[in-house]
A protein has these predicted regions:
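Non-catalytic accessory segments flanking enzymatic or RNA/DNA-binding domains
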Residues: 1-263
Length: 263
């Protein structure tokens, strides 16, 4: 069966294990049903996720023009502490920025090979954690807007990483030794004084079961360097497809790529 279209990040459904669906221009492919089967991917072009142009993807699925103009690629998307919608100050499009920023946000701890701190809209739980490949996650603060969550994250990331090391995430090491409750208790004092009112004492640690077993070796590839790829799908974690022999590809990093996929 052949599918042609634009890659978007995989759709996920929390289950045991997580269910994954590949979205190719609206064609939805249930990937869990394809484990042990051959998938061929051929890169044939680009389609910006914002304007639809065939210009090469610059970053995050956007062409260069849209990356520097779209409110969905503004600085506050990557750095919540730069949010200004709560002040009525526009970055690129105030109405869109209000919709994104002026809603409850969660500051969380997650285990993705190391313990990390992060920020997400409350409505994006647990999708955000699944996309990051977090096997454990714990909300530690709930704020009224994105800026407030960013202030907490800035304070905490002086002591804890806010990045995911994709290789460690895919190696599955030390997962059973992580106690996020204990970790939270140790860092509560690092909250800015004015932000401590947002702290929450969740007792439930989220555990996410991925359809994935770490291979002996991991070799990441991109469609830029390998525009024609075929392999046997073995597992999925985060936004990574893992094939036989340890070849892995980050689907989210290929948003906006146009491909032929044969199953």
């Amino acid at each position: 069966m052949l599918f042609r279209g634009q890659i978007r990040k995989m759709i996920t459904q929390l289950a045991e294990p997580v269910q994954y669906y590949l979205n190719i221009s609206g064609d939805i492919i249930h990937l869990n049903e394809l484990f042990g089967k051959k998938i061929s991917i051929q890169h044939i072009g680009y389609q910006c996720i914002e304007c639809g142009s065939s210009e090469p993807v610059f970053r995050m699925g956007f062409c260069k023009k849209c990356f520097f103009e779209s409110p969905f690629a503004s600085d506050s998307i990557l750095k919540p502490e730069l949010s200004t919608a709560h002040l009525g100050v526009e970055e690129r499009n105030l109405e869109i920025e209000k919709n994104i920023q002026l809603q409850p946000h969660i500051v969380y701890l997650a285990y993705t090979g190391d313990v990390k701190v992060g920020v997400t809209r409350e409505s994006q739980i647990p999708t955000r954690w699944i996309d990051q490949g977090a096997t454990f996650a714990l909300p530690i603060a709930r704020t009224e807007n994105r800026y407030e969550a960013g202030v907490i994250e800035v304070a905490l990331k002086q002591h804890i990483s806010d990045k995911t090391n994709w290789r460690k995430m895919l190696q599955n090491e030390y997962e059973e030794e992580i106690d996020l409750l204990d970790f939270r208790n140790k860092i509560e004092s690092l909250f800015p004084v004015e932000s401590r009112k947002f702290a929450i004492n969740e007792e439930k640690i989220w555990k996410i079961d991925f359809p994935y077993t770490a291979p002996e070796k991991i070799l990441a590839f991109t469609l830029d360097k390998h525009p024609n790829f075929s392999g046997i799908l073995q597992g999925i974690k985060g936004q990574y497809l893992c094939f036989q022999n340890g070849d892995v590809i980050n689907i989210r990093n290929h948003e906006g790529y146009v491909v032929d996929i044969e199953i």
